[in-house]
């Protein structure tokens, strides 16, 4: 597993790089984990509906090829893209999603934030509020896209959408529990737990 820390990046630029990486990889290619933040952007998944974008203001909307519906990415949110040959690892997509949820819950538990999952609604929640989203694409047995964990960000752009297609879905973030939390530190813990699941 090769890990890249990419800093803050434009969504479309990284999306194109993920597609290019996946298109040229073969059975000998190493899996990769890309860690980054995005400049403000709304992304529509393949199941996304235009009516779930309520008031985008000046924030760009990108129609993506990942699973799921609409979400928001912005600075202070940890994004981890999982470029993995799940066929080689003999992993189903549902198993991968479940493992990613486990990893996120472990990270949050480390900070004593009580997190849970919901049946039929991928992602991770604290009570009724969503703290992390998951959306993947599989092509030729290989995944791209991944997870987004709200660490210490401006959550107000989520009010301009129905997050993940759920009207009035409230969002939360780690800084509500730990005001001085740093994204870089959270990223390190995420990698640690990720590598316990995926060598």
From Swiss-Prot:
Cellular compartment(s): Cytoplasm
Function of the molecule: Catalyzes the transfer of endogenously produced octanoic acid from octanoyl-acyl-carrier-protein onto the lipoyl domains of lipoate-dependent enzymes. Lipoyl-ACP can also act as a substrate although octanoyl-ACP is likely to be the physiological substrate.
GO cellular component: cytoplasm
List of residues binding substrate: 66-73, 133-135, 146-148
Enzymatic reactions: octanoyl-[ACP] + L-lysyl-[protein] = N(6)-octanoyl-L-lysyl-[protein] + holo-[ACP] + H(+)
Source species, domain of life: Bacteria
Record has Transport as a keyword: no
Chain ranges passing through the membrane: none
GO MF assignments: lipoyl(octanoyl) transferase activity
Catalytic residues, chain numbering: 164
HAMAP family membership: LipB (MF_00013)
This protein's record includes keyword Transferase: yes
Chain ranges of the BPL/LPL catalytic domain: 27-199
Note: In the reaction, the free carboxyl group of octanoic acid is attached via an amide linkage to the epsilon-amino group of a specific lysine residue of lipoyl domains of lipoate-dependent enzymes.
Protein name: Octanoyltransferase
One annotated GO biological process: protein modification process
Family: Belongs to the LipB family.
Recorded name of the encoding gene: lipB
Pathway the protein takes part in: Protein modification; protein lipoylation via endogenous pathway; protein N(6)-(lipoyl)lysine from octanoyl-[acyl-carrier-protein]: step 1/2
InterPro entries: aa-tRNA-synth_II/BPL/LPL, BPL_LPL_catalytic, Octanoyltransferase, Octanoyltransferase_CS
EC number: 2.3.1.181
PROSITE patterns: BPL_LPL_CATALYTIC, LIPB
Keywords: Acyltransferase, Cytoplasm, Transferase
Residues with site note (Lowers pKa of active site Cys): 130
């Amino acid at each position: 597993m090769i890990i890249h820390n990419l800093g803050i990046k434009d969504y479309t630029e990284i999306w194109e790089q993920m597609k290019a990486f996946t298109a040229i990889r073969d059975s000998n290619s190493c899996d990769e984990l890309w860690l980054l933040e995005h400049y403000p952007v709304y992304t529509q998944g393949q199941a996304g509906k235009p009516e779930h974008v309520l008031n985008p203001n000046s924030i760009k909307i990108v129609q993506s090829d990942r699973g799921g519906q609409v979400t928001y990415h912005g600075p202070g949110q940890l994004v981890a893209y999982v470029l993995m040959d799940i066929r080689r690892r003999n992993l189903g997509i549902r198993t991968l999603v479940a493992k990613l949820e486990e990893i996120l819950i472990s990270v949050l538990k480390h900070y004593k934030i009580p997190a849970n999952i919901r049946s039929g609604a991928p992602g991770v929640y604290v009570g009724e509020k969503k703290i992390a989203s998951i959306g993947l694409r599989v092509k030729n047995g290989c995944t791209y896209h991944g997870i987004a964990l709200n660490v210490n960000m401006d959550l107000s752009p989520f009010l301009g959408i129905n997050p993940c297609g759920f009207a009035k879905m409230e969002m939360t973030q780690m800084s509500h529990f730990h005001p001085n939390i740093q994204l870089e530190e959270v990223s390190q813990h995420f990698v640690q737990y990720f590598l316990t699941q995926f060598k």
